[in-house]
Amino acid sequence: MAYIKVGIISEPSKMLTIPNIFDLPSIGAGHDGYVFHFNGKAIKYLKYTPKIRGEKGLMTLEKFETLKDVKTKRIIMPEDAFYTEDDEFAAYTMPFVHDYSKEIGALNISPGDFYYGDFLDAILDLEQDFEELNKAGVVAREINRGSFLYDLEFLKMCDIDKYQIGVKRPNELNRNMLNFIIAKVIYYQILEEGANKEKLKALNNWIKKTCQSSNFVPNLKKKLEKEPTRLISEGINTLSKTL
């Protein structure tokens, strides 16, 4: 059993409870928690004790309280906290994003099915999102392939549990991470279309180079602006070559 509750702890009659979270429809699981459907939202049930989560740099109540107040468009932030019977922070809800890139058959939508204009919109939103992270003293961390979701609006980012809070000078770190995210969109799409060992090595070197480049995103935006109706799949290989 995994009983959790949400609401005002001092007023038990007003608490919403989930007797066993593992009875909910599963969305997925990772090294730090389990994700389920709940009332039109996604709810993440956290692994480990609060102390161990803090030691591992995972989600803590302090981090939750910081991130839930950061207003973003593309980065999925937590909304409500759930607690155990002993009033320990144990789970949180967040907006549910339907990831069409993981669908099979007719419902599948690949990132390559979107347009340069969609990619540009995502970049502009992410730039604003990262400005909000900077203001809050938060640095994005531990971005991997599972962090990328693709709904009908193109790119969304999840897995904020290892984001770092209380950073005094986050701007440069976040710029590098924003570069990394945008470069990885291109990288993963090229991999999807096929890449031999030589090409893979070149792509990895390109990723390392772009992460610390101040010109990468401005140059990419200019290229995307010129051909907003071009399919990403049609021009993906030129994006890494010309930037």
What does each model-identified segment do?
Residues 41, 92, 156-159:
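Protein kinase-like catalytic core scaffold
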Residues 7, 20-83, 110-116:
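ATP-binding glycine-rich loop module of kinase domains
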Residues 1-18, 55-59, 224-243:
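Regulatory N- and C-terminal appendages and interdomain linkers associated
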Residues 151-243:
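C-lobe/activation-segment region of protein kinase-like
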Residues 130-150:
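Catalytic-loop of the protein kinase fold
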Residues 73-122:
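Conserved structural core of kinase catalytic domains
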Residues 37, 96, 149-151:
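Conserved hydrophobic "DFG−1" position in protein kinase catalytic cores
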Residues 117-131, 135:
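Amphipathic alpha-helical segments that line or abut small-molecule/effector binding pockets
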